[in-house]
């Protein structure tokens, strides 16, 4: 038995085997060590060969590869796919930001004074140009924005929230829990399906700091229901001398096609309606990097900047550089550089051209049909819009697994597996054809 164990390959020799030439060496060594230790602990008999060991290491390494971040082809049709990284960034915008991200910069350095500067100054200026707000601030995500705003203005004070807006977002993060941890005191008003202006008005007292309106971006209440508009809330808070805050979740610029803008708040219009402070995610409909964008009155933003917690939530030069390029693309009307918006605006005929190109060049049996999809990212949950799908013959679950194995993430609809071209980029088409034909040759 010991003789058999002595024949096991040496750890330091494994990376040199031809089977492992392109493997990530540190992980390979760690995984190989675990595999060899397991073989020894199980007292494998003398029949184990070097090839058996290599196969065991390969299988174990495959598990590591599954968790390693890698590019995927999103063929689900959901453009802002939370599990697939939300909004993709344009390669052109990344190129424009690369030099700044890889150099020293005046991130917090005043070129005119030679002293410490404001890291948010340039981004704030761009956001003021884009939205017409008084001032702006950036933190690392919208949950951080909610926390910072509540902690700054409502610590140990009451915040009025409609029961119909006490939402839970992804990963079990709930508005009531965020409020509790921020130091704010939640005061629920109205009912789940109906909240009236009088509910807010009758609940304001000397300990009320603000009214928080939470946009129902990842669910909707239909039927016998009503809510109070932010315009009416703004008038009430101004009259009663308290703040109003709109947690928008996902903000967009201008308009959206396919009637997606209907009943979906537009950031610029909200600013004009008299909202004191707004926050939303940078990597949802805005189509940029993960961050929390806060817009509001100058004195309120200044108070947020003076909160010591901001240092824990601040963003780095990488985030600011990419965000700046995104905002400039909007200001220059280079909307084709905002990848999610570009995909949303594609016509059915454009998507059909892509689908036909794939169908005409693959060996698997499939058909093109019109379908419907959703924007995703916790936005517009009840608003589907048209798309084009390539539907494949055969067992849907087996097809889904096979495509996923090769990095193409599709979806199943009515017991058929399909690739939805609403979320497929033009430069993915050739790769999709190559992958599908490779699968069919197996």
UniProtKB/Swiss-Prot annotation:
It is found in: Cytoplasm. The modification N6-(pyridoxal phosphate)lysine is found at residue 284. It holds the Pfam family SelA. GO terms for molecular function: L-seryl-tRNA(Sec) selenium transferase activity. GO terms for biological process: conversion of seryl-tRNAsec to selenocys-tRNAsec; selenocysteine incorporation. Gene3D superfamilies: 3.90.1150.180, Type I PLP-dependent aspartate aminotransferase-like (Major domain). It comes from the Bacteria. It catalyses: L-seryl-tRNA(Sec) + selenophosphate + H(+) = L-selenocysteinyl-tRNA(Sec) + phosphate. Its cofactor is pyridoxal 5'-phosphate. One of its GO terms (cellular component) is cytoplasm. The keyword Cytoplasm applies. InterPro entries: PyrdxlP-dep_Trfase (IPR015424), PyrdxlP-dep_Trfase_major (IPR015421), SelA-like (IPR018319), SelA_trans (IPR004534). Keywords: Cytoplasm, Protein biosynthesis, Pyridoxal phosphate, Selenium, Transferase. Pathway: Aminoacyl-tRNA biosynthesis; selenocysteinyl-tRNA(Sec) biosynthesis; selenocysteinyl-tRNA(Sec) from L-seryl-tRNA(Sec) (bacterial route): step 1/1. Its EC number is 2.9.1.1. Its main location: cytoplasm. Converts seryl-tRNA(Sec) to selenocysteinyl-tRNA(Sec) required for selenoprotein biosynthesis. PANTHER family: L-SERYL-TRNA(SEC) SELENIUM TRANSFERASE. NCBIfam families: selA (TIGR00474). Belongs to the SelA family. This is L-seryl-tRNA(Sec) selenium transferase. The gene is selA.
């Amino acid at each position: 038995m010991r003789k058999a164990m002595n024949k096991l390959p040496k750890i330091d020799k494994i990376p040199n085997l031809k089977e492992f030439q392109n493997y990530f060496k540190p992980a390979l060594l760690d995984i190989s060590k675990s595999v060899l230790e397991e073989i020894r602990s199980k007292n494998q008999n003398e029949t184990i060969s070097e090839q058996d060991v290599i196969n065991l290491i390969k299988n174990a390494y495959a598990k590591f590869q599954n968790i390693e971040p890698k590019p995927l082809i999103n063929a689900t049709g959901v453009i802002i796919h939370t599990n697939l990284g939300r909004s993709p960034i344009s390669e052109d915008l990344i190129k424009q930001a690369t030099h700044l991200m890889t150099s020293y910069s005046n991130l917090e350095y005043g070129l005119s004074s030679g002293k410490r500067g404001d890291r948010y100054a340039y981004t704030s200026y761009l956001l003021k140009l884009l939205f017409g707000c008084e001032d702006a601030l950036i933190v690392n995500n919208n949950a951080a924005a909610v926390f910072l705003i509540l902690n700054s203005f409502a610590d140990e004070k009451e915040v009025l929230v409609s029961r119909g807006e006490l939402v839970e977002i992804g990963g079990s993060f709930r508005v009531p829990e965020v409020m509790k941890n921020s130091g704010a005191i939640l005061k629920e008003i109205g009912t789940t399906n109906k909240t009236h202006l009088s509910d807010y008005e009758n609940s304001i007292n000397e300990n009320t700091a603000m009214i928080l309106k939470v946009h129902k971006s990842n669910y909707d209440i239909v039927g016998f229901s009503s809510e109070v508009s932010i315009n009416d809330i703004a008038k009430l808070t101004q009259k009663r001398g308290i703040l109003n805050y709109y947690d928008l979740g996902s903000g967009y610029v201008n308009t959206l096609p396919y009637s997606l803008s209907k009943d979906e708040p537009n950031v610029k219009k909200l600013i004009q309606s008299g909202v004191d402070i707004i926050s939303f995610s940078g990597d949802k409909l805005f189509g940029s990097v993960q961050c929390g964008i806060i817009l509001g009155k100058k004195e309120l933003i200044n108070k947020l900047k003076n909160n010591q917690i901001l240092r824990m939530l601040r963003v780095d030069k990488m985030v600011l550089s990419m965000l700046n390029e995104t905002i400039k693309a909007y200001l220059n009307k280079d909307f084709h550089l905002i990848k999610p918006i570009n995909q949303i605006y594609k016509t059915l005929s454009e998507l059909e051209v892509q689908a036909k190109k794939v169908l005409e060049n693959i060996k698997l049996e499939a058909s093109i049909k019109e379908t419907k999809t959703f924007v995703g990212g916790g936005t517009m949950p009840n608003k589907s819009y048209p798309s084009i799908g390539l539907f494949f013959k055969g067992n849907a679950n087996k097809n889904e697994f096979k495509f996923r194995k090769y990095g193409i993430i599709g979806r199943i609809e009515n017991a058929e597996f399909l690739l939805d071209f609403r979320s497929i980029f033009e430069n993915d088409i050739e790769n999709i054809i190559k992958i599908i034909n490779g699968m069919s040759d197996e």
